[in-house]
């Protein structure tokens, strides 16, 4: 969880932490760096994300980092980006 000098706080759900720990360290660092440097510093994290379509995923956003996807819920009232899942683009939506 990060919030110092950032517009939005990044919070990981337990499932997302499990996803992250399964990845190699360089990939973990790349994804964490993206969240810290690109997403958390924005006044509106929707500016670089993409809304997910569909009944189950309609309220969520995705961020693309190479072949990896970060699925998030943006909670404006709490100024939080909640990371729900992290995974390869072929598997993360299952």
Range-by-range predicted roles:
Residues 1-61, 67, 75-79, 91-94:
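Basic, Lys/Arg-enriched alpha-helical interface segments
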Residues 70:
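NAD-dependent ADP-ribosyltransferases
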Residues 87:
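Residues forming the ATP-binding cleft of Hanks-type serine/threonine protein kinase domains
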